[in-house]
């Protein structure tokens, strides 16, 4: 893991298209501004993990439904 120190209004560049800028520091909270192309999904990690869990659950359900339908067809 790369660890960088930045002050307010300083940024890091990720590739050619993504900039992460420190907007504010208030107590133990850091506000970041992220400038990225619209096709790049940006989520808080806990939201991203929830999305992944839901996608996995939906995929498992889909395979169960397909199995049930194919067994009824026989």
Swiss-Prot record:
Q: Does the keyword Repressor apply?
A: yes
Effect of deleting the gene: Increased expression of flagellin (hag), 30% decrease in motility halo. Suppresses the motility loss and flagellar assembly defect of an fliW deletion. Suppresses the phenotypes associated with deletion of the intracellular flagella chaperone fliS.
Record note on what altering residue 7 to E does: In sow-12; suppresses the motility loss and flagellar assembly defect of an fliW deletion. Binds FliW
Q: Which UniProt keywords apply?
A: Cytoplasm, Repressor, RNA-binding, Translation regulation
Indicate the principal place this protein occupies in or around the cell: cytoplasm
Mutation: residue 33 to R; reported impact is:
In sow-11; suppresses the motility loss and flagellar assembly defect of an fliW deletion. Binds FliW
One GO molecular function term of this record is: mRNA 5'-UTR binding
What does the UniProt entry list as the effect of changing residue 49 to S? Inhibits motility and flagellar filament assembly, reduced binding of FliW
Outcome of altering residue 25 to G?
In sow-20; suppresses the motility loss and flagellar assembly defect of an fliW deletion
For this chain, the family text in UniProt reads: Belongs to the CsrA/RsmA family.
Q: What does this protein do?
A: A translational regulator that binds mRNA to regulate translation initiation and/or mRNA stability. Usually binds in the 5'-UTR at or near the Shine-Dalgarno sequence preventing ribosome-binding, thus repressing translation. Represses expression of flagellin (hag) in a post-transcriptional fashion. Specifically binds to 2 sites in the 5'-UTR of hag mRNA in a cooperative fashion; the second site overlaps the Shine-Dalgarno sequence and prevents 30S ribosomal subunit binding. Mutation of either binding site abolishes CsrA regulation of hag expression.
**Name listed for the protein in its UniProt record:** Translational regulator CsrA
Q: Which organism is it from?
A: Bacillus subtilis (strain 168)
